[in-house]
Amino acid sequence: MQAKNLCFYLSDHGFGHIARNIPLIAEAVRRTNGFVYVVCGKRHLEFAKANLLELLTPEQSSHIRYRAEHTDIGLILQQGTLLVDTAALTDACAQYLAERPERAKQEADWLRQHDVAAALCDMPLWSISACEQAGVTLLYVGNFTWTELYREFLPEHIWKAYAAEYQKIQHGMLYALHNPEMLEFLPRAELSETSLVARPFHPDEIRAIRAQHTCPVVFVALGMSAQFTQPVSVEGVEAHFYVTEGVPLTGSNVTVIPYSTLHTQDYVAAADYVITKAGW
């Protein structure tokens, strides 16, 4: 077993990025004697740590180091809608890009100080330049880049600045169902395609969820970007709804799943129907 330090740079836009990397982090820990650093948002790291404590032994878990950072902008939506707030997103991305050079420089210093041999990037733009400056091999793992999304909404100088960073990537692993448009922005990358990844399911928990209901079970998630203020009653609907926080459904047949819930994947597996946005 090799003793190499690794680092995961993960988007804190929603919980999909951290969730899909939990199995990868666990496997990385099992395969190295070095430290595995995980850089993401504070709540995201709390979620990851709780999951990884279940997947790994205490000795293995002791090899993980968590570092809380706001890593990504993602999308900003108009309140009460799923429409992009172009003005707010433009301002946020402009500030993010202005901070990128200094942030990348500081991160490159950190990578050298911690003797990181390789990094995995799932979205955060500044980590690409940081690894390039530090001479650290970076693997981009994902199913899209922000560039092909942002060019639909943002000024050209912003999405092209994102494109310039993604074009530095030399190694990429693309999930099944990845956005074909992303290939345009990875011209230098040696790419491989893989399947999908998910946290393990728990059959007993799935059966217990289903046993509570004789009606259809519906899972609803609209992501962390959406902020709704107008409630929608589903009281008369012949179904039970499990919803993530922020989904505005109300009624005695609605159960809200807190962000602190470890195994949201079991609610998905227990559902007869899933209503969601185009996320992980």
Residue ranges of predicted features:
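Short, polar loop motifs at secondary-structure junctions
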Residues: 41-46, 123-126, 176-181, 224-225, ...
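A nucleotide-sugar donor-handling region in carbohydrate enzymes
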Residues: 149-227
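Donor-nucleotide binding loops and adjacent catalytic segments primarily
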Residues: 25, 199-273
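A donor-sugar binding/catalytic signature common to diverse glycosyltransferases
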Residues: 118-123, 266-280
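Active-site regions of enzymes building and remodeling cell-envelope glycoconjugates
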Residues: 53-70, 136, 188-198, 236-264
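Conserved nucleotide-sugar phosphate-binding/catalytic loop shared by glycosyltransferases and other
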Residues: 34-98
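Conserved nucleotide-sugar donor-interacting segment of glycosyltransferase catalytic cores
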Residues: 103-163
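A short, glycine/small-residue-rich beta-strand->loop->alpha-helix junction that serves as a flexible
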Residues: 10-22
